[in-house]
Amino acid sequence: MRAWLLGLALASSGSAAMAADQAQTPAASDPVATATPTGLTFGAVFGATDLSGRQPRALRLSPDGTLLTSLRPRADDRDRLDLWAQDTRTGDERMLVDSKAIGSGAELSEAEKMQRERARIGGSRGIVAYDFAPDGRSILVPIDGDLYLATLDGKVRRLTDTPGGELNPVVSPRGGFVSFVRDQNLFVQPLDGGPVRAVTTEGGGTVHFGEAEFVAQEEMDRRTGYWWSPDERFVAVERFDEARVHVATRAAIGATGTKVYEQRYPAAGTPNAAVDLYIMKPDGTSRVKVDLGRNADIYLARVDWLPDGSGLLVQRQSRDQKRLDMLRVDPATGKSTILFTEKAGARSWLNLSDAYHALADGSLIWRSERDGFGHLYRFARGRWTQLTKGAWVVTGLVGVDEAKGKVFFTGNQTDVLEQHLYSVDIARASAPARLTERGWWNSATMDASTTRLIVSRSSPNQPTQVYLADAAGQRLSWINENAVAPGHPYQPYLADHQPTQFGTLKAADGSTLHWKMITPPLDPGRKYPVFFQHYGGPGTGQQVTRGWAGPLPQFLAQQGWIWFQIDNRGSYNRGKAFEDQIYHAMGSVEVEDQLAGANYLKSLAFVEPTKIATYGWSYGGYMSLKMLEKNPGVYAAAVAGAPVSDWKLYDTHYTERYLGDPAKDPQSYAGSAAVQDASAIRDPLLLIHGMADDNVFLDNSTAVAAKMQASATPFEMMFYPGQTHAVGGSGVAEHLWRTILGFLDRTVKERK
């Protein structure tokens, strides 16, 4: 359950400081201070134009670094994406593939719809992914269930034309093949125009080849189930069988009818899919089974080939997620040996990470939380060298320059509210060199030659900007300056843009909790209601950062609300001790820390203490329920969007990571559930859910509704036909927020 924040760009980013820092005030030269006031409206915030400006997605550099490609929303439809290309030498840009020109508009297969939900792109249309050929001369483009090959001169060749659709398409490492999954089997097609051939043929029913199982996609950030060797001699292929996985009957209730799906859903404590790994040639011959150990009840976490293709690295995670073994596999025999093992503490778990890199000399750059914080290590010839250390976190691995002996990574060494790009020596521990400017939330990717960086950044007053930089972090050119100047969609609203304030509180155990706040212009003596937004869950990025929070919080401030967020114990990027406090105790310290935030708000002279509304989605929706149940009278009203109400209903990998096996620790599940005490809720509640949600099933909300109805406990409810976990889309997002704010106006603002 990665964070779901409903609304427009309500992604954690921004802001806030009254207790510890001074509020940020726009400088005289800041356009915020000089623009003419024009108030935000529902139509502006939720209309076809993204007020945060043009936001390219899936930015990539071509293998030779001369071309920058991205997916961009159309001017008239921000949910439809086209493929664009920009010459990094001249800055010239052009649309490379027009999604409307080649798209058929065909309905996607149910398998592809579910994959898109797992990747959090379910609401996007047009071109949502692409893959460069290794020579950089062509690009594989999937659209509307079929595959196309685009060349740099704008010509497009159709590769497939089938009713079933293709999943997980890639160009092989040397450009010889396009590979994809169709009808639960792996296929390859020579790019020279030869016939498509099946690599596997046994897929069907409950058996899948080349795909990632549900929990791998949803909870492990693993999207594929096959991996080419660098020389194209072999392909490693996952096989999974869902025969023993519980069949959940899910009704997708739409506007004109209901479809019933028999979805294989591994709820906590129930069997997972049986997973095996094979290595074979691209024609399916010479198949060998990889030895994953005697215990079949494990997770296939990550699979990677060594740079020279001599072996396979496989990360095997135990079912309880307290042990992870790094296996080296012989591709000729499938035999595996353990290179090293990571183990969690007694009241902890292991977080998976993509921050690792195999080097040509046989060593490995590896992120571990073994010292209590996520740091980089080098594993060479059986010995470990710690490359970064301290009470801060490495958040991602960006690139490795083996020739110059440098590792590039993102982290929060400088400021826990800021993410920066750093470099450090490979050979020894040294002080990291920061390569990005203070005051921003940054992310970065790097080209294969480790000479160019794509850096994205934002701040509370500046929507996301993207620039091209050299390996020293020096900006070479803007990719998307996105300056809020005349012509920018947000420019008319700058004069009313309010500064974001940051501050800190102390939790009951002395932990520092960071908060952010946006207020309306404050009139002396007046008290204001609070829109208290929360997520609160583990395993995701923090919510309180110095990044752009989008126009919605500003809209709320213009509507007279104070917008407030606080990061509680149990959340990510603060070290394991901070995160581990929710172990076998969900809905405990998170609720306590949100209460500390509410009590702090009530101490402020400009806050109306009887008018604090709370809102959350997904884990945040669960938190809304728990906050009302545990703290009656504190919150004037709550909105619970797509909440998990009973953790026994949620999936294995996420839930068991934090609560364990429900058969072994039923008390943790009982104490963490929200449905049991729903009838105790006495404050106004609005329950919201998508009626086709395949992640947090609608059953979670109907269980709460039934419990409250049985006890004659009043509440309000809004369910969205055809909508999945991310409720939104044209018209729907505006309806959602009109519903939320209409409810809060009645129950909070107008409260006597």
Residue ranges and their predicted role:
Residues 1-5:
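Bacterial N-terminal signal peptides that target proteins for export
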Residues 7-13, 17-446, 451-464, 468-469:
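Beta-propeller folds
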Residues 58, 223, 246-247, 301-304, ...:
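Serine-hydrolase catalytic core recognition
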